Amino acid sequence: MMTNPKPWQQGSLIEVEITDLSDRADGVGRWEGRVVFVPDTVTGDRVLVRLVRVKPQYAYGQVQKLLTSSPHRIRPHCIVADKCGGCQWQHIDLAYQQQAKQQVILDALQRIGGFQDPPIAPILSSSSGLNYRNKVTYPLQRSAQGNVQAGYYRKGSHKLVNLNQCPVQDSRLDPFLAQIKQDIQEQGWGIYNEERGTGKLRHL
């Protein structure tokens, strides 16, 4: 597929090989010496990217097509992983997640903390990489039909992805989520409305 003749501008298409991950789990690639951050990618991916925010030396892009899939890429366990902003690592296999998170800590200690060779214990995780969150905070909203919704915001927005369960939280919390939403609905409690500045309940 042909890319634009002047590709370093918003809306242009470029091909990028992902060579690293940022501390936010965005894929990091380079194009003619400039850095490109691409969410939902992993080291080893080669992707066709549309630039959505462009600065002189770096840009953010959105994947338009996966050209080559990384061996670290897996199918997310969550059915709304491509929309939900609650976690950024679900498309990455657990072993590489641990490796990448370890590197994030090391980079922070060295570059920000000034430590030359800090001792870091291995990253610990659940055996499956799921059901490990024991504390969650869900924003609350009402749908256009007036139904109580709770979940996480869509990536880069305050539009809610309504959830009844989440594969990274402790599964014992799932029944409470649906029940509490039902209780709020039945009691008619006021959900905070960002546009109007009304209502009291903002988070669950």
Language-model features: where?
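Accessory RNA-recognition modules of RNA-modification enzymes
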Residues: 1-204
